[in-house]
């Protein structure tokens, strides 16, 4: 039996991912954080160390337009579409996807596919 908790395993995977993954001004990093109740996504330029745009299930835009629970795949899809729209508005078309140590499945996958369909390429 493993002595690492689920959170520690996620942090270990995220460290391993971030070793080879960084965003630039031409191709920023799309970072996803998934909690039990919400999902957050940011487009980050690691060279300049600033966030170019962000979206989450805690925003007024999401809460006022959506009648779905924030911890569902439908909510993640809405966040992915919001983020892609904001990124395209700032002229960002290509990103590097950072799943944040979470498995590419469920809510993380729904956010990524929605962002792709809205126009981001990765």
UniProtKB/Swiss-Prot annotation:
Gene Ontology biological-process entries: translation
- List, alphabetically, the InterPro entries matched: Ribosomal_uL18_bac-type, Ribosomal_uL18_bac/euk
Q: What is this protein called?
A: Large ribosomal subunit protein uL18
Q: Which GO terms describe its molecular function?
A: 5S rRNA binding; structural constituent of ribosome
Pfam families given in the database record: Ribosomal_L18p (PF00861)
Q: What does this protein do?
A: This is one of the proteins that bind and probably mediate the attachment of the 5S RNA into the large ribosomal subunit, where it forms part of the central protuberance.
Keywords of the record, alphabetical order, are:
Ribonucleoprotein, Ribosomal protein, RNA-binding, rRNA-binding
Q: Which NCBIfam families match?
A: L18_bact (TIGR00060)
Q: Where is this region: Disordered?
A: 1-26
The disulfides recorded in the entry are none
Segments of skewed composition (Basic residues): 1-19
By sequence similarity, the record places it as follows: Belongs to the universal ribosomal protein uL18 family.
Provide the Gene Ontology terms for cellular component. Answer: cytosolic large ribosomal subunit
**Organism in which the protein naturally occurs:** Prochlorococcus marinus (strain SARG / CCMP1375 / SS120)
């Amino acid at each position: 039996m493993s002595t690492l908790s689920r959170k520690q395993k996620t942090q270990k995977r995220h460290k391993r991912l971030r070793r080879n993954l960084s965003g630039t001004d031409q191709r920023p990093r799309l970072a996803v954080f998934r909690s039990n109740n919400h999902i957050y996504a940011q487009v980050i330029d690691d060279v300049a160390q600033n966030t170019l745009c962000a979206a989450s299930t805690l925003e007024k835009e999401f809460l006022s337009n959506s009648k779905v629970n924030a911890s569902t795949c439908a909510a993640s899809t809405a966040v992915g579409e919001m983020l892609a729209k904001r990124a395209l508005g700032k002229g960002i078309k290509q990103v590097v996807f950072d799943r944040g140590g979470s498995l590419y499945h469920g809510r993380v996958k729904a956010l990524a596919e929605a962002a792709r369909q809205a126009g981001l390429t990765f």
